[in-house]
Amino acid sequence: MLCNRTCPSSDCGILCNHSVPSFPPFHSSVANIHFTKENNLKSNIFEHNNNSPTLRSSSVACNTCLKIIRNDSFHCTKCFDFDVCRDCYAKQAFLHPCPKPHFVLVRSSIPSVASLTCSVNSMSVSPQSNFMYAICDHCEQPIHNVRYKCSVCDDYDICESCLTDNSHSNTHAFVRITKAYPHGLPSFHLFPQFLSAELFESASTVHRSVQCDNCLAHPIVGPRFHCLVCEDYDLCSSCVSHVHHDHHSMLRLTREISASPLHLSKPEKPKVLNFDFKLVEDSILPLELSPGCPFYKIWHIRNTSCQSWPSPLYVKFNGGDKLFPGDNPYSFPITSSVHPGEDVNFTVALKVPEKSNKEIFTAFFNICSDDGSVFHKSLCAFLRVPKSFSRISKSSF
């Protein structure tokens, strides 16, 4: 496309985007393309506005569609790691929490196939590389082929390279996943392996009562992989990469946790208490929040059942978005019995996410007794974040 401005030449191969309103004005061209003896493609990419070129590696994923960026993209200079591919930028189909975003065009270090009519073999990305639709929480790079997901936390994934040196809790076991899930993968919500890091360190790395079902090694020394689909099927670290069904998730256990074979099942549902209540009012403190700011969510409820509630009572997280660090938020306990018709305030300490592409956050909580029993109705915390992420008012809840 030629622009209405004065260009050096209409035959110089200049690509003009002045007439496209979705992109900032620029002229760019690809020059000095040559092949080495190793058939590696090299190019010098420059812009006519005399700015220094910015090259992009092929390992960056779009923060909107999560696809690997092959061509040019846009990077927010105000943020540490926020990139949008050209398609999502043109459609304006992305949510960015930065108060004052400033996007700059970033050139791909590998020219596109369409523009250079080169073969697919010249690309540096292996055709066998399988994107797992997840970003490593340790190295912040896209995860390929093998994904390790925390079995306890809602959203924590690492790649195979970061498995041994990640800083995540060693009491949490990881699940080995080899199947890509484009539409997301539900959390496993298993219990931690050990109650404390001290118990984990004191446990043995030899799984005395377990035998590898492939090489028949007994006992399994080092990481043990337990199939979450099959009944009583375990593999050692040497066999897990080339045997068994590719799409079966395997729980990775680094320490011995029992003297008998592991039989995983869903946790027993807690006892349900048929106490009824009515939500009178809910509020937050402070009234104005900013990213990363801690706050209190308060539910003012009334006992509408015919009997008194036992004490103590707590609020426990039951799903949705995690608006708190750790496994559960701090809840202020109700230390006295609540009689029919009486009002009580349940308060939980939460925190506004510091960086997120989401606009709406929803978290659910249960009222629990001291023995783990739960009320049959849940409490909900709803948070709507403005696109500017500069102010969050009380009306957002």
Curated annotation (Swiss-Prot):
For the ligand (Zn(2+) 1), the binding residues are: C62, C65, C85, C88
Taxonomic superkingdom:
Eukaryota
Q: Where does Zn(2+) 4 bind?
A: C150, C153, H168, H172
Q: Where does Zn(2+) 2 bind?
A: C76, C79, H96, H102
Q: Which gene encodes it?
A: nbr1
Entry keywords, A to Z: Endosome, Golgi apparatus, Metal-binding, Repeat, Vacuole, Zinc, Zinc-finger
- Signal peptide limits: none
The answer, when asked if Metal-binding is one of the entry's keywords, is yes
Q: What is this protein called?
A: Autophagy receptor Nbr1
| UniProt-recorded Gene Ontology molecular function terms | cargo receptor activity; zinc ion binding
Please indicate if the UniProt record lists Cytoplasm as a keyword.
no
Q: From which residue to which do the ZZ-type zinc fingers run?
A: 57-112, 131-182, 207-258
Quote the function comment for this protein: Autophagy receptor that interacts with and facilitates the transport of cytosolic hydrolases Ape2, Ape4 and Lap2, and of mannosidase Ams1 into vacuoles. This Nbr1-mediated vacuolar targeting (NVT) pathway depends on the endosomal sorting complexes required for transport (ESCRTs). NVT components colocalize with ESCRTs at multivesicular bodies (MVBs) and rely on ubiquitination for their transport.
- Which compartments is it annotated to reside in? Golgi apparatus; Endosome, Multivesicular body; Vacuole lumen
Gene Ontology process terms (BP): cytoplasm to vacuole targeting by the NVT pathway
